[in-house]
């Protein structure tokens, strides 16, 4: 399930502190997202896995490289200057030597791949509470704080969105932004087909399980602690997508 998987393992404070204030709406939206995933994104993800490993790795590397455009300002806003410098070097090296991000040259030069950062995480670092848990149509699990963070991205906080959808240059168009987001989601979904099938199969309450996984992983990302969930990877290309 694309909508749970892409957002659910992508990343808010403690489960015990976050209330499910709109549970009826959330469950209905969760069911809708599950249906859309089953008829659209899961089949696409399964087909995507038949592509040669270099193509899949290149796609993953490229969308990961693009994500640095939003991660770097959030590193700075959170006072994580070392991470900001690391991600800036990754962006420069992989965009140039890595041929617009197709190859992860930066890792081989000592600039490690770090977790993505977003405005929801920045708001948490600034002391804003998570608010209520919410499941958004298509976008999946979030919180009130996370939703505000997403709104900030669309209102000018995401440089990649500005470059494409806002036509800041003549080289890109809005379809490039949405294609990159779609590619990122399908790539992640393809790597975690078995993982989510297992969660769904072994969960007494799938909705509750996804909610718990999302909130736990969000807390991990905000606190910058260790990994909770491993994603599938193309080991031959040293390519791991844990977001």
Cite the ranges covered by each PLM segment.
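Short N-terminal segments immediately surrounding and downstream of signal-peptide cleavage
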Residues: 11-27
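Surface-exposed patches in mature extracellular/periplasmic domains of secreted proteins
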Residues: 54-57, 78-85, 107-108, 221-228
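A structured, mid-to-C-terminal "fold-capping" secondary-structure block
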Residues: 12-16, 126-243
């Amino acid at each position: 399930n694309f909508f749970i998987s892409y957002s659910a393992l992508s990343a808010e404070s403690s489960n015990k502190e976050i209330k499910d204030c709109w549970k009826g709406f959330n469950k209905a939206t969760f069911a809708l997202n599950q249906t859309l995933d089953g008829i659209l994104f899961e089949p696409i993800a399964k087909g995507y896995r038949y592509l040669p490993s270099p193509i899949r790795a290149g796609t993953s590397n490229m969308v990961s490289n693009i994500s640095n455009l939003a991660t770097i300002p959030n590193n700075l806003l959170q006072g994580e200057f070392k991470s900001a410098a690391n991600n800036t070097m990754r962006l420069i090296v992989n965009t140039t030597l890595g041929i617009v991000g197709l190859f992860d040259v930066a890792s081989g030069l000592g600039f490690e791949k770090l977790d993505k950062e977003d405005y929801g995480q920045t708001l948490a670092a600034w002391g804003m509470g998570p608010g209520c848990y919410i499941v958004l149509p298509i976008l999946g699990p979030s919180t009130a704080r996370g939703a505000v963070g997403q709104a900030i991205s669309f209102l000018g906080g995401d440089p990649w969105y500005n470059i494409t959808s806002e036509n800041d240059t003549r080289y890109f168009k809005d379809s490039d932004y949405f294609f990159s987001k779609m590619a990122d989601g399908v790539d992640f979904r393809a790597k975690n087909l078995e993982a989510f099938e297992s969660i769904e199969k072994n969960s007494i309450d799938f909705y509750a399980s996804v909610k718990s996984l999302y909130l736990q992983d969000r807390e991990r990302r905000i606190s910058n602690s260790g990994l909770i969930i491993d994603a599938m990877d193309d080991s031959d290309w040293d390519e791991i997508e844990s977001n």
